[in-house]
Every structure is written in structure tokens, then in C-alpha cells.
Design a protein with these regions (language model features):
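GH16 jelly-roll
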Residues: 1-203
Length: 203
């Protein structure tokens, strides 16, 4: 909320302040396998440091593919295949966001997803390099589809729900989840990462 620089990548100046995130992505698409990133997260509450795979599809209501999604009722079936590691976050054990927790998510589409809140062995806002990894298994006749999530070599969680199948691009980025209007101005300014009360932060 304290950022006063140029607006980049968005087209609005909101009363709560200017928020400009950033992301990089691979040009190529990659399928199931082991994904590992060594990174220092942005060490401030209010911004989400994220590592994710993403593949996006839209199917018009008149298309054959639309019929594969009978729970969709709009003009388009929007399908986003995604695997996420996001920090910081809050979970049932914490009233406020903390770097002692992360979100591990798997998506087949917005209403077919699993979000898991995981306590970490140690806080990761210590300015040190940490290794974030997920092993993506799409499964076969002998193996159940799953995603195994690791931090610093320790397996912390396995998701068996809504496991993506198509090849995806790998993304690294920082963004600002806003879900609660804490100051009553009509705009969400405090999300599950906290309030963004800083000028700049680096992931």
C-alpha cells in the first residue's frame, strides 16, 4: 500500500494503494515429473511468493469439449490445470498470516480443486535459500495420481485430489491476494497473506 511508483501490469489506481506483482514463465510446456525451485521468498506479509504450473483452456458452449464438463452452465467452460506452492498463508492453527505456513494446491478447474494449508518445520522468511519441490504423478494402472509437496527435502503433504494431467508452463511470481475490506472503502485490501504495507519486496 505504500508503493508510489508507476503502475505496471494493471490499469487501476485503487484507494487502498497501487499493487504491482510480477511473474515469469517458461516458454515451453512440461508434463508430469519433479519440479524444484531454490528461492528466497519475499520476506514481508501482504505479498504471496508463488511457484506453480498452469495450463488454461476455454470451451464454448457449442463445442464437443464443453460436454465433458456437465457442472458448467455458463457460455464457456473455463478449465485451469494448476499445481501451486504459495507462501505465506494462514491456516486453522494461526489467526494471522505467517511464514510458518504454506498453501499446497491442485486444480483441474476453479470448482474442482484442493487447497491444503500446511504448517512448515520452520519459518522461511529468514533471508536464506530454501528448496521448494513437488513431484507430479499423473498415475497409471498401477499408480494413483498424486502430487507430493516438499520443502527443504522433507515431504510435507501429498494430494490425491484434482490432479492435473496436461503439460503446463512453470511460473514463478509474486502477487497480492485481497479478500477482505478491512478499512471499509469498498475494496479488498487484506488477503490471506496479510496487508501489503511496504514499498517494494523481492522474491
Amino acid at each position: 500500500n505504500l508503493y508510489t511508483g508507476d503502475v505496471q501490469g494493471c490499469n487501476k489506481n485503487l484507494p487502498g494503494g497501487i499493487r504491482t506483482g510480477a511473474a515469469i514463465a517458461t516458454r515451453d510446456y512440461y508434463a508430469s515429473g519433479c519440479y524444484e525451485v531454490v528461492a528466497k521468498v519475499a520476506p514481508v506479509l501482504g505479498a504471496c511468493s508463488a511457484i506453480w504450473t498452469f495450463e488454461y483452456e476455454e470451451y464454448d458452449k457449442d463445442s464437443e469439449e464443453y460436454k465433458n464438463y456437465p457442472d458448467q452452465t455458463g457460455k464457456l467452460a473455463i478449465v485451469n490445470h494448476e499445481i501451486d506452492i504459495e507462501l505465506p498463508t494462514a491456516n486453522a492453527d494461526f489467526d494471522t498470516p505467517t511464514f510458518h505456513a504454506a498453501r499446497f494446491n491442485t486444480y483441474e478447474m476453479e470448482n474442482r480443486s484442493k487447497s491444503h494449508f500446511q504448517t512448515l518445520p520452520e519459518a522461511v522468511d529468514d533471508g536464506q535459500w530454501h528448496t521448494y519441490r513437488f513431484d507430479w504423478h499423473t498415475g497409471d494402472a498401477n499408480e494413483q495420481p498424486r502430487v507430493d509437496f516438499y520443502v527443504d527435502g522433507q515431504l510435507l503433504y501429498t494430494s490425491y485430489e484434482h490432479i492435473p494431467t496436461p503439460a503446463s508452463r512453470l511460473w514463478l511470481g509474486i502477487w497480492f491476494p485481497a479478500s477482505k475490506d478491512s478499512d471499509g472503502d469498498g475494496f479488498g485490501d487484506t488477503g490471506w497473506t496479510g496487508a501489503a504495507d511496504f514499498d517494494t519486496a523481492v522474491f
